[in-house]
């Protein structure tokens, strides 16, 4: 599990991205790069690192499910992810 401070930082970054999304879009359309530079760095969505929604793990993230491979495997074995079942042939 990730440190609680890293999870909190990630959530704070997500809020900043949402807060400035409309303003960033407008400034980009105008071509006002000077004003874009004055916005907070963390308001840029490119700086976000995808993290597991359950425990905050940053590596082995599965975008389709919003979780890491470890949590995906555990939940899939328990049958808690709809439409996912263990393969057998």
From Swiss-Prot:
Keywords: Ribonucleoprotein, Ribosomal protein, RNA-binding, rRNA-binding. The keyword Ligase does not apply. GO terms for molecular function: rRNA binding; structural constituent of ribosome. GO terms for biological process: translation. One of its GO terms (cellular component) is cytoplasm. SUPFAM superfamilies: Glucocorticoid receptor-like (DNA-binding domain). InterPro entries: Ribosomal_uS14, Ribosomal_uS14_bac/plastid, Ribosomal_uS14_sf. It holds the Pfam family Ribosomal_S14. Binds 16S rRNA, required for the assembly of 30S particles and may also be responsible for determining the conformation of the 16S rRNA at the A site. Belongs to the universal ribosomal protein uS14 family. Part of the 30S ribosomal subunit. Contacts proteins S3 and S10. NCBIfam families: PRK08881.1 (NF006477). HAMAP family: Ribosomal_uS14_1. This is Small ribosomal subunit protein uS14A. It comes from Streptococcus agalactiae serotype V (strain ATCC BAA-611 / 2603 V/R).
């Amino acid at each position: 599990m990730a440190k609680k401070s890293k999870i909190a930082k990630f959530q704070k970054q997500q809020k900043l991205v949402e807060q400035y999304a409309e303003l960033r879009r407008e400034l980009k359309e105008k071509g006002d790069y000077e004003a874009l530079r004055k916005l907070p760095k963390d308001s840029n969505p490119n700086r976000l690192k995808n993290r597991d929604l359950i425990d905050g793990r940053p590596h082995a993230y599965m975008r389709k499910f919003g979780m890491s491979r470890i949590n995906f495997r555990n939940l899939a074995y328990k049958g808690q992810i709809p439409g996912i079942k263990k393969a057998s042939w």
